[in-house]
Amino acid sequence: MKRRITIALGIILTVFIFYCPNCYAETQPELRMMRATAYADTGKQTKSGIWPYEGVAGAREDLIGKTAIVYQRLPGNKIGELIGIYEIEDTGSTEGCINGHVIDIWCPNLDECQLFMNRVYEDGCQGKVFVQFIDTEG
């Protein structure tokens, strides 16, 4: 149920941003440019203690429990299409995740990781994406 609410909230937020950008400007969550990576099933639970599933990502520890809305970065630092909506339930093991420069998207296998990485590296954007973190707890 929480996942459905999170996805619905993300879709509503995305539609609102694109169709009423001036209405939303005062309360819009910070849009961050981050490097995106992908990881496959490790056979371990996430930092928050759950088993990973599609829609889970890793980021800095203080972001656990938040939802990340991830957009493609286009040349000229323009926002592209929605890549996905992810629940931050893990921290990742790289220094970039720990320091807040990387979002690490969970994929069920290495082939899916490669497809994800191909998508974020297209158009010469070097794996950079735009991310908004929203609080969906409570």
Report residues per predicted region.
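N-terminal Sec-pathway targeting helices
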Residues: M1-G10
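Short intrinsically disordered, low-complexity segments
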Residues: G10-I12, Q72
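C-terminal segment of classical bacterial N-terminal signal peptides
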Residues: V15-N22
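Solvent-exposed, well-ordered loop and adjacent helix/strand elements within mature globular domains
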Residues: C23-G138
